Amino acid sequence: MFTLKKSLLLLFFLGTINFSLCEEERNAEEERRDYPEERDVEVEKRIIPLPLGYFAKKT
């Protein structure tokens, strides 16, 4: 039981660190973008491939 708690605590701690690093990187990317057109293209890249990839795998 004790080793299970230690393992879960370690996973939670590492996950929290990983999430905070990803969030910092994402914020840095958003700050680097100067033009709103670039931001719109990035949003399209994130949204559109997901449904297209989903339907492509089903056929």
Curated annotation (Swiss-Prot):
GO terms for cellular component: extracellular region. Expressed by the skin glands. GO terms for biological process: defense response to Gram-negative bacterium; defense response to Gram-positive bacterium. Residues 1-22 form the signal peptide. Residues 23-44 form a propeptide. Its main location: secreted. Keywords: Amphibian defense peptide, Antibiotic, Antimicrobial, Cleavage on pair of basic residues, Secreted, Signal. Pfam families: FSAP_sig_propep (PF03032). It comes from the Eukaryota. It is found in: Secreted. The keyword Secreted applies. Antimicrobial peptide. Has activity against the Gram-positive bacterium S.aureus (MIC=6 uM) and the Gram-negative bacterium E.coli (MIC=3 uM). Lacks hemolytic activity against human erythrocytes. Belongs to the frog skin active peptide (FSAP) family. Brevinin subfamily. This is Dybowskin-1CDYa. It comes from Rana dybowskii (Dybovsky's frog). The lineage of its organism: Eukaryota, Metazoa, Chordata, Craniata, Vertebrata.
